[in-house]
Amino acid sequence: MSWLYEPGDQKHDLDESDVRIRPNPKGSRPRTKRRPNYDALPVGMVLTVNLARYQVLTENGEITATLAKELRKQGAVVGDQVYLDGDLTGDKGSLARIVKIGPRKTLLRRSAEDEKFNEQPIVANADQLAIVMASANPDPNIGLLDRYLASAFASGLDAILIMTKTDVEEAKEFLENLQGLPIKIFKTRSDSFKLKDLKKSLSGKKTVFVGYSGVGKSTLVNALTGTTLDTGDVNAVTGKGKHTSSAAKAIPLEDGWLIDTPGVRTFGLGLIEKDDLLGAFEDIAEITNECPRGCEHQLETANCVLNEENEIPLARLNSFRRLLKVLEAEQWERR
């Protein structure tokens, strides 16, 4: 509509909004809200990140890219689907530019123990988390396992546990902690790697491998992928291993992807909330809808509906409550 009255306009009192003000030719131009459409650009998957350089796989091969300025705060991680412009030749010294990051189906993240509010995204768009633990030397860590599982379930990932060195110790008591949880368990020996069943579980999926140093993760990754990642020994005094992976890296399988991550001895749960975990236990979540507001869903919690007779297997309920306590302890430390 023009700023002049047109025939048929309803008359009204004039005010300052009816005055047309000529724009100041020396003033700054208003920013447009329109953004470029990058959907037609070539697409790739981030394979690894090294400082500000991203190795990206496109349909024409592997290239090196950097992030567009407006994406630097968000950042891209291994597994991200990204849209590219610039030099896509992949020649030595060439550099493409990541101008858009596609929607993330899943996002695995952690926080450092001393930075509870600073979450670190690790891998995007993965399907499952493979947790590698040794039956002995070093001993399995139930606290770390619970953190891995809580993060996986809250992120929408399936979980796999791979127990190595089962020829040294079977760890039956440790594995009893997992009764009732939706997790596949595989076992390997130091003297032989029978990986047929494990490979079937990895087929057609993007699987993130995690585990602290010395459990045999790099050796296992080498056997599965045919790569030659460095492996490390366990210190006889401390019982701890040396980190042999320095950054997350996506490695192709025959039908799928294996994403190796650096070994860590801590895995902070960052800002994951109780409701995030409940989303992975739909049968339990349905019952907790009847719980009083603010219910902690523990055995000692008064009026908790989970304490009434129900069809949830006791082992599954106990495992859920153990994971929930891990989250509650983390939330308490953040206060």
Predicted regions: what they are:
Residues 61-78:
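Beta-strand/loop nucleic-acid-binding surfaces
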Residues 52-56:
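Short aromatic-glycine-enriched beta-strand elements
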Residues 42, 61-65, 229:
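Short beta-strand segments
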Residues 39-50:
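Structural detector for short beta-strands of small beta-barrel domains
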Residues 118-186:
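Phosphate-binding glycine-rich loops and their immediate beta-loop-alpha structural context
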Residues 1-12, 18-21, 37-40, 74-82, ...:
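Helix-rich effector regions associated with P-loop NTPase G domains
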Residues 158, 165-215, 226:
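Canonical P-loop GTPase G-domain recognition
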